[in-house]
Swiss-Prot record, chain B:
The keyword DNA repair does not apply. It comes from Arabidopsis thaliana (Mouse-ear cress). Belongs to the CCZ1 family. This is Vacuolar fusion protein CCZ1 homolog A. The lineage of its organism: Eukaryota, Viridiplantae, Streptophyta, Embryophyta, Tracheophyta. One of its GO terms (molecular function) is guanyl-nucleotide exchange factor activity. Signal peptide: none annotated. The gene is CCZ1A. Disulfide bonds: none annotated. It comes from the Eukaryota.
Length: 682, 515
């Protein structure tokens, strides 16, 4: 990715990542705590006796909070149960209270004071337990009865725990131990059961003073991208962000990213890793899909935008309302201020202003700043959050590279990317369709694409990230995200038909003079879809014929047709006949095609048109075609002034068409025949 | 066999210009070429004089198309007006015992072929004469060219017709009735599966753009079959003919095995000396008049001159050595009929796949293009694809007898595209001599019908049962021709037309409708 592209622009208004108005604002007076429940995606605001909660997914700032009353007391943390029937509140380091929202019953859970203390808790949807409480002595797993009357301890995982991290997205809990807190016990509490990870250590560079740095919970980030689970670890001494990927039975370090700020946080948007370099106030985007650990784009500030920009170019429109720093608005936003908490995947909680922001990617800006079109297309084809925008950008790029007359090899690569991505999404789509029948409600196909009918048949609309469940037996990705149900996505994949419709037809007019170049591109396109065994709108063949005929490349036109690169069809045949007005060979190709397609009527009519009326009649006789007007043959023969032929035709028609001798046509031409030459006998 | 020693009277081949030597004493001027070259001038002039007389006489009745053939008692005279007022005449001896039974049109096509090839390499004869009115340049090019061409007949016959092997080295074999199921002046195509065809076309696009913005032409052959071309039908035929003669993998490998015989015959070593014995005036004076370029006569059809280089490109020293002068001067050049453009010819070979690349010469003169850069580009952009395509085609290729259709001995010609397909020669030889003779006779009839139609498309359907119970069939329709021999004695006419109909539907997409 090219970073110099923006250097020239240089304006502070340029960004690849932005947050925009309106935010979700919790203007509850006397609130004393702001929490985020990642399992239920709830923003929770507490007062001394009330709990306000907002749904953050889908992100809607206007949604009113729901209100629950709880007894007064300190709140260290608060989480709704997964069925939202109960609220669990950690009151102290030895007490957790559970409130049943319906029955208003309260259940208290206390641990042995003194010997151990509670570090935190979370709800689980594993079959084994419903609630996990992490203590300094290990993790207790509890099952609740349906009425939440009691907690039953089902299992204890003994370990010395300094601190822990958990995200519901990954269902992964990492328990830190050791002097440097860099030794980890990990468990995944997924719907398939509880899996214990092998114990592992994280890398920590020694500081210059040779003191051993201690890892804190804030230095670790669990993220999910492309259905893979990663743990990111900040190593401040080395100024590196280490990546660990979790497999079923192994934790493997997979490279490191450089960091430019001692304060660091991460978000994940649309499977892209956003690394906030807080001191530098910039975001760097990484796409972990590719092996390269190079950033997708140059570091740019996070921007605040007044309103959503959609189809228009971001740089042009938003300059006046964008602000990288703050205070232009009533919201008084200070970027990367201390009160910000970054919530994985894509939320920022501003504790000071009590607002929640959702992070957005500006795909247009990213593509505008990239010069390598092939990798850009690959990048865009992996986007799902704004699939439609990604798709439109891809189409735009495809059009642009053709109009810019990029070398055919470059265009070929681009086409290959798009076709392969489509083919892949078709294949993946069918897989998921099967799965949806017995699993979750299938995702509705939003914003039906112009070609939705075809898409639905092939099932390509469904996002390509096929979830790999633990139960699905995939050896590699045992861990995976649970995002799928709510991903209201269509794929940015572009079908060959759409490529034809939105790329080739739109460039055709502008490139008539360069039909040779366009033919080269279309050939590559046909090769690409043929390699993927896909079909395309047959109008592309009509276009190919026009272009080849225009540049008088009849030899190739002939090869394209006889080798069936141009698939035979009635439309194609008619185009050949039409283009064949300049070249009899091409016209014959059209005639041959009509015959091969057994389009008897058209074949016979075209033959007569070309003056081969005897051949036409012979063919009609052989194939018993009576739909062609008999007068056509007669008129053709009469026009050629060959009375013998006329006589022969009259005789054949009398045999071919019952009752022909009674028609007025017969009399007319029989009369003409007798007038002209009495010597010819019928 | 239809062979003859070059020394006897069985073959005369001459080319002359009616616009030259019209005053007495200057008759020799009109002779451009005569075979055998060592025949005395009076005999040469008598052959040409007779031909000229016949042409002048027949033109009285048919100014557009004069004499085509004269059948004498012992000889056939075949006429071909190669260019306006430039005539080629072939006189062949009739001899039933040696099997010297010809179809006149097949012989005329030999004349046509050698002329087309000559024009492809040297440009039109008229243009040469106009450039150098003494005719010395033209003669010095024609003599080795046609002699080289005639010598190639021996090699061809060796590979195609094993019966003639005994005579190789001593004799020339002109196409006899045994070759009635083939059509000179057409190309034979390889049938491709769609996905391979798409790959090929994609390769063609790559090749065509190897010289940057300058569009090249290309032709691809697999063994002796055409895979793709971007040239017009006529140019395709000429270049294809040459490639099959000299460039394809088969041509390269068969040269070495059979050439040793031919050296004993009217081989290359003698030709140059003999061409110097050319009848007109003193060659030496011509040389001095025309300067240095006369010393090096390019002989494009010279055999055994092409080898495959390390980089896959075919190398030849026919056009000179690469070391001398400008590096591009040694690159072969040809003329395209359709565009009248002079093109550099590059040949690249990978196993059975031969790729010919044509680039306009003026682009190089202008400095827009360098051959070595193009070569580099081909290797970089195309060599992987070439590898893959060669593999694909080889895998799907049915071998020598791929286009054999059981029970049929056939020839299909498409005159529009100049493409033909026929039973493999090995299968044709299983036909009885009578069958071949009958078919040859039938073709002769069709030829004369066609020539009477004067370029208009004829529609014909002929089925004949010959003496040995063979059915010989000719079907001509809208520019396509089908010839067939069916040696199943008991078949009725109805069965026969059915059989032809089935063949047509199955293999010719129903092009030949049978009543």
């Amino acid at each position: 990715m090219n970073s110099s592209a923006q250097a020239g622009v240089g304006s502070g208004a340029l960004s690849h990542v932005y947050i925009h108005h309106p935010s979700l604002r919790c203007n509850i007076p006397e609130s004393n705590g702001l929490f985020y429940d990642d399992a239920n995606r709830l923003l929770i605001c507490t007062t001394s006796s009330q709990v306000f909660s907002w749904e953050t997914s889908p992100f809607n700032p206007d949604v009113p909070p729901s209100v629950d009353s709880i007894s007064e007391g300190p709140i260290l943390s608060i989480r709704f149960s997964l069925d939202k029937k109960a609220i669990a509140v950690q009151r102290s380091d030895c007490e957790i209270q559970l409130f049943n929202r319906e029955t208003k019953q309260i259940l208290n859970h206390k641990c042995k004071a003194g010997s151990e203390s509670i570090l935190g808790f979370f709800w689980s949807d594993s079959p084994l337990c419903d609630l996990a409480i992490v203590k300094t002595s290990g993790m207790d797993l509890f099952a609740c009865d349906s009425m939440l009357n009691s907690l039953r301890l089902v299992e204890t995982k003994k370990a010395n725990v300094n601190w822990y991290i958990y995200t519901h997205e990954t269902r992964l809990v990492l328990l830190a131990s050791g002097l440097q807190c860099k030794t980890f016990n990990g468990f995944q509490l997924s719907t398939a059961g509880v899996v214990r990870l092998p114990r592992f250590e994280m890398t920590m560079a020694r500081s210059e003073s040779n003191s051993k740095p201690i890892l804190s919970a804030g230095d670790l980030h669990l993220v999910t991208v492309y259905g893979r689970i990663y743990c990111l670890q900040v190593d401040r001494e080395a100024m590196l962000l280490h990546l660990y990927r979790f497999y079923r039975d192994a934790v493997v370090q997979q490279g490191s990213l450089p960091i430019y700020s001692s304060k660091l946080s991460v978000n994940v948007v649309d499977n892209l890793l956003l690394v906030h370099q807080i001191d530098a106030k910039v975001v760097i985007i990484y796409d972990l899909f590719v092996d390269s650990r190079a950033p997708v784009s140059a570091p740019l500030p996070l921007l605040w935008r007044g309103y959503q920009v959609s189809e228009t170019s971001s740089q042009a429109v938003n300059k006046e309302i964008e602000s990288s720093e703050s205070s232009t608005s009533n919201e008084n936003i200070v970027m990367y201020e201390d009160g910000w908490t970054f919530l994985v995947p894509d939320l920022i909680l501003d504790q000071t202003n009590k607002v929640l922001w959702k992070i957005h990617l500006d795909l247009e800006a990213i593509s505008a700043s990239s010069s390598d079109r092939t990798s850009l297309l690959e990048f865009l084809q992996r986007r799902k959050l704004e699939a439609n925008k990604a798709k439109q950008l891809c189409l735009g790029i495809a059009r642009a590279i053709i109009l810019e007359r990029r070398p055919a090899t470059q265009v070929t690569q681009a086409i290959d990317v798009l076709v392969t991505a489509y083919s892949y999404s078709v294949k993946a789509g069918t897989y998921k369709e099967i799965k949806n029948e017995n699993a979750t409600a299938s995702t509705p196909t939003p914003g039906a694409s112009p070609d939705s009918e075809r898409h639905r048949q092939s099932g390509s609309n469904i996002d390509e990230e096929v979830e790999m469940n633990l139960s699905s037996g995939s050896q590699e990705n045992m861990f995976c995200a649970d995002e799928q149900q709510e991903s209201q996505l269509s794929s940015p994949a572009i079908s060959p038909d759409e490529l034809y419709k939105f790329v080739f037809t739109s460039v055709e007019e502008m490139m008539v003079e360069e039909s040779e170049y366009l033919v080269a591109i279309i050939t590559e396109f046909l090769r690409s879809i043929s390699a993927e065994k896909l079909k395309v709108d047959l109008n592309i063949y009509v276009m190919t014929i026009k272009l080849l005929a225009y540049s008088k490349r009849f030899a190739e036109l002939s090869l394209f047709t006889t080798n069936k690169i141009i698939e035979p069809s009635k439309e194609v045949a008619f185009q050949l006949l039409d283009s064949g007005r300049q070249n009899i060979r091409v016209r014959k190709l059209g005639l041959d095609m009509l015959r091969q397609l057994s389009l008897h009527h058209d074949y016979i009519s075209s033959l007569v048109q070309d003056g081969y009326y005897l051949e036409a009649l012979r063919y009609a006789q052989k194939h018993k075609v009576t739909s062609v007007r008999s007068s056509m043959f007669l008129e053709a023969a009469f026009a050629s002034n060959d009375m013998q032929h006329l006589a022969a035709i009259l005789r054949v028609l009398s045999e071919l068409i019952p009752g022909f001798k009674e028609t007025s046509e017969y009399y007319t031409f029989y009369g003409l025949l007798n007038d002209t030459s009495s010597s010819v006998a019928v | 066999m239809a062979s003859m020693s070059s020394g006897d009277e069985s073959l005369r081949l001459c080319m002359f210009d009616l616009r030259r030597g019209q005053t007495e004493g200057q008759e020799l001027e009109k002779i451009l070429f005569f075979y055998p070259a060592d025949l005395d001038f009076s005999t040469q002039l008598s052959v040409i004089g007779l031909s000229e007389g016949l042409i002048t006489f027949t033109r009285l009745f048919s100014p557009e198309a004069a004499c085509e053939v004269i059948e004498a008692e012992r000889h056939s005279h075949v006429f071909y007006e190669a260019e306006p007022d430039i005539w080629m005449v072939m006189v062949v001896e009739k001899n039933k015992e040696t099997g010297a039974i010809w179809r006149i049109d097949a012989l005329r096509r030999v004349l046509k072929e050698v002329h087309s090839l000559f024009v492809m390499f040297h440009g039109s004869i008229r243009a040469l004469i106009e450039k150098e009115p003494t005719g010395g340049l033209t003669r010095s090019l024609l003599y080795p060219f046609i002699t080289d061409y005639l010598s190639t007949f021996q090699i061809w016959s060796l590979s195609e017709d094993c019966c003639c092997e005994f005579f190789v080295g001593k004799k020339l074999q002109l196409p006899t009735f045994r070759e009635t199921l083939r059509e000179r002046g057409t190309v034979q195509m390889l049938t491709l599966a769609r996905d391979t065809a798409v790959e090929v076309q994609s390769l063609v696009q790559v090749l065509d753009s190897c010289a940057g913005s300058l569009r090249c032409h290309s032709m691809i052959l697999f063994q002796d079959l055409l895979v793709s071309t971007t040239l017009s039908a006529d140019d395709t035929v000429d270049l294809f003919t040459f490639a099959v003669m000299r460039l394809t993998s088969k041509a390269l490998s068969s040269d070495t095995s059979s050439w040793s015989y031919l050296r004993k015959g009217p081989g290359s070593s003698e030709i140059s000396s003999r061409s110097n014995l050319a009848p007109v005036g003193s060659i030496d004076s011509l040389h001095s008049r025309n300067g240095n370029n006369m010393h090096h006569v390019i002989r494009p059809l010279q055999n055994d001159k092409w080898t495959k280089g390390k980089d896959g490109f075919l190398i030849t020293d026919i056009w000179g050595l690469e070391t001398g002068g400008s590096p591009d001067s040694a690159i072969p050049t040809i003329w395209l009929q359709q565009t009248q453009e002079r093109m550099y010819l590059l040949a690249y070979q990978h196993k059975s796949l031969t790729l010919l690349l044509l680039m306009p010469t003026n682009a190089i003169v202008n400095g827009d293009l360098s051959i070595s850069a193009v070569k580099q580009q081909v290797i970089e952009d195309a060599s992987l694809r070439i590898l893959k395509i060669e593999e694909n085609i080889s895998r799907g290729w049915g071998g020598e007898n791929a286009y054999h259709i059981k029970g049929y001995r056939y020839l299909v010609v498409d005159n529009d595209t100049k493409v033909s397909r026929s039973s493999p020669s090995g299968k044709v030889t299983t036909l009885a001599k009578e069958s071949l003779l009958a078919l040859n006779k039938l073709r002769e009839e069709v030829d004369s019908e066609k020539s009477r139609a004067k370029g208009q498309e004829k529609d014909m359907e002929i089925c004949i049962r010959a003496k040995n119970n063979v059915w010989v069939i000719a079907r001509v329709t809208r520019g396509k021709e089908l010839y067939m021999a069916l040696e199943k004695g008991s078949d009725t006419l109805l069965d026969t037309t059915d059989a032809v109909g089935r063949f047509s539907n199955r293999y010719c997409s129903g092009a030949f409708l049978m009543d």
